[in-house]
A protein has these predicted regions:
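Serine-esterase "nucleophile elbow" of acetyl-processing enzymes
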Residues: 34, 38-113
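Surface-exposed cleft-lining segments at the edges of enzyme active sites
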Residues: 81, 111-119, 146-156, 194-198
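Oxyanion-hole/transition-state-stabilizing segment in secreted/luminal serine hydrolases
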Residues: 120-157
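Short, conserved phosphate/pyrophosphate- and ester-handling motifs at nucleotide-, phospho-/glycolipid
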Residues: 247
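Structural motif
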Residues: 70, 138-141, 175
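Substrate-gating cap/lid alpha-helix
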Residues: 187-222
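Conserved catalytic region of serine esterases and O-acyltransferases that act on ester linkages
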Residues: 2-38, 253-352
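Alpha-helical scaffolding segments of alpha/beta enzyme cores, especially the outer helices
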Residues: 157-171, 204-211
């Protein structure tokens, strides 16, 4: 069965309440997951530090009459920024800083991601987001899937939970970008041939996630091997000290690939009708676009006229220098939204 058909079967099972769709043999899956769990114990020692909080305001130098953009991150430890020590090195901070630079507006970041979360935790996370009295976010990023694989969550259930989360956020009025399941074959203590099998399971889930998210009005970016052959070529640099979560450089690599899609979702990125064939862009059936994106890290998939989707390889944008958040209470704005003298200095982000 082709990769596209497998992804479509999983997505269809999720949409219509079907049971689990087998990805590969159950015994093989169990062996893969046992090795991945062993790898996590070897590299993490069973104790993971709490990710630094990056909640706050970015781009305070752009304060003006417009309200700040509201940006929320949901998902698992990757979305939370597990593996780095400084808030400014987390994907939330990197994306918020980049978004502020492109929009030339402050950005308020809220991160509700939970390390260890699976897709069934998205219901709780979305409810937290929609209950926020400050209003519906302008854009949300969801990064989820690795724990679904390692804990053997049925793929149909995983995709159903993600699709529901995207639908709820889109119905409320938020734009949604999903970073799909990363490639578990890049974890160093997982060896061949299990590394190949872990990669296959991860990619099949990523493709099915793409179909589910796009059909609910979201956009996806394939994280794959966390966005590029750099990870396999330089694992010591792009993985963190635990060899399982990304390092600061790894998160920056992933964020550079996601930022253009985040900006495009908000209408801040120039959209061209031209599809660059040399970059393998094109209009494809959703399932085929999803399958291809899962194999090519950093690929964006967005809905076109059903049952088609646009597959794009946006050029990565250099991120601003690492920045730390400004707490909302100290963002240096008065009641009219203008800068307050003597406040917000030293911790605000400014253009380089």
């Amino acid at each position: 069965m082709s990769r596209a058909r497998v992804a479509r079967r999983i997505a269809a099972g999720a949409a219509y309440g079907g049971g689990s769709v087998g990805l590969i043999g159950a015994a093989t899956v169990g062996l893969v997951l046992a090795e991945v769990q062993l790898a996590k114990r070897l590299v993490g020692g069973g104790k993971a530090p709490v990710p630094p909080s990056a909640d706050g305001r970015y781009g305070v130098a752009f304060a003006g009459p417009s309200d700040p953009l509201r940006f929320v991150l949901l998902g698992d430890s990757t979305a939370a920024g597990q593996g780095v020590r400084r808030a400014g090195q987390t994907p939330g901070a990197l994306l918020a800083s980049g978004l502020a630079a492109v929009a030339e507006r402050p950005v308020d970041l809220r991160n509700v991601a939970l390390p260890g979360a699976r897709s069934d935790d998205l219901e709780r996370q979305v409810s937290l987001v929609l209950a926020d009295p400050s209003g519906v976010p302008d854009v949300c990023v969801i990064m989820i899937g690795a724990n679904d694989v390692t804990h053997r969550m049925p793929a149909t259930q995983s995709v159903r939970c993600l699709s529901t989360a995207v639908r709820r956020l889109r119905t409320a009025g938020a734009e949604v970008v999903v970073g799909t399941c990363p490639d578990l074959g890049t974890i160093e203590p997982v060896y061949q041939p299990l590394r190949w099998l872990a990669r296959r399971v991860s990619r099949q889930l990523a493709a099915a996630q793409t179909i589910g998210a796009v059909e609910q009005g979201g956009r996806t970016v394939s994280l794959g091997d966390l966005l590029g052959p750099e990870f396999e070529a330089n694992p010591r640099e792009l993985f963190g000290p635990d060899n399982y979560h990304p390092s600061a450089e790894g998160y920056a690599t992933a964020s550079m690939a996601m930022l253009p899609t985040l900006c495009a979702a908000l209408g801040l990125w120039p959209e061209s009708d031209h599809l660059d064939g040399s970059r393998r862009e094109g209009m494809l059936p959703v399932a085929k676009a999803a399958s291809r994106a899962a194999r090519e890290a950093g690929t964006e998939v967005t809905a076109a006229r059903a049952p088609w989707a646009l597959l794009k390889h946006r050029r990565r944008r250099r991120l601003p220098a690492h920045t730390e958040p400004v707490p909302h209470d100290d963002a240096g704005t008065d009641t009219d939204g203008g800068p307050m003298p003597g406040r917000g200095s030293g911790a605000t982000w400014r253009r380089a």
